[in-house]
Amino acid sequence: DKKEIARVANDIRLQLNPHPAGQMELNVPQLKDGTKLYGMQHKYDETCLFFPSQSQTCHAYCTFCFRWPQFVGMDEMKFAMREGEQLVQYLKEHPEISDVLFTGGDPMIMKASMFSVYTDALLDAKLPNLKTIRIGTKAVSYWPYKFLTDSDADETLKNFEKIVKSGTHLAIMAHFNHLVELSTDPIKEAIKRIRNTGAQIRTQSPLLAHINDDADMWAKMWQKQVSLGCIPYYMFVVRDTGAQQYFGVPLVKAEKIFRTAFRKVSGLARTVRGPSMSATPGKVHVLGVSEINGQKVIVLQLLQGRESEWVGVPFFAKYDENAIWLDDLVPAFGEKFFFEDELKTKYTKTA
């Protein structure tokens, strides 16, 4: 019975925390007229995420992908929107936004002619607050032919050039999970062609048990990325969704891997930050392990926060070598982390 199989599968999916960090409850914005924009997220002041409905698939279906609800056919769990005009209107209503991140799925699944409809709408609006367009994509590593031999490869690159020539910074947020992904000639040529448009490529990846939990590999990967003209950006902690128990790396171990790799690279690769958790309060950066008044603690800070005043404030958790997520940590001093009361007051649906 296909219906029964689908029902059971969906029940299991709903148990896997499909929208961690309050994405569906807290991040969905609305226009001043009350229209909910379910194809967008606005968690941090300066940046909004846009999910074009045509990009809700991907070149790769990574088992560790935290965007898996976009792919499984449960429409009520999807973020998707067709209206570029509503994106423009929202940016007009929110002058604090400087960056728009196209995400999915993968925006580079779209034909160039369709993607340019969205980017042209942004450029034609001449929004004074829009400084950067970001594109989150796995295509550079998984399907470099998008920029080489696909029927719309040249059109894609011309669109990139158009964005750059408009005075808008274009950042390709490329997902590279392992050094091996940088080894082929098509990858290298795709990177070269993208950079020739004036776009910058910033690289990021989660730290994954069984795949890339090796400091030497990370150091070599960052070095190779720099040699190809890319900018190492983030090492993420696997999110609390899907197969986290398989791919997750304890935070203490993750920080040690990051620190060991960081020490092996020159300053040009030290643009990278991590390990970082995209949790409900914001991007939580694991700074390391220390000792305060004889107590061993994990030192953390927020790189981004739902409230900008939270950013950069150090806070401390009791040392726990098994913790793999913020929710596993206990405050080292006092009963709560410094942001918890405000989080509960302003964001009561999940806090």
Regions found by a protein language model. Give the residues of each.
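Flexible, acidic/Gly-rich N-terminal and inter-domain linker regions that tether
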Residues: D1-K43
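N-terminal pre-triad scaffold of radical SAM enzymes
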Residues: G34-F66
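Conserved alpha-helical substructure of the radical SAM core
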Residues: Q41-T47, W68-V100, M110, V117
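Short acidic/polar capping segments at secondary-structure boundaries
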Residues: Q54-C58, W68-V72, G105-M108, V140-S141
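A short secondary-structure junction signal
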Residues: A60-F64, G73-M77, D185-P186
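Conserved AdoMet/S-adenosylmethionine-binding subsite of the radical SAM
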Residues: E85-V88, K92, M108-K253, I257-V265
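Residue-level recognition of the N-termini of beta-strands and the immediately preceding loop/turn
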Residues: S98-V100, L130-I133, L170, T271-P275
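Auxiliary Fe-S-binding modules of radical SAM enzymes
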Residues: A219-A351
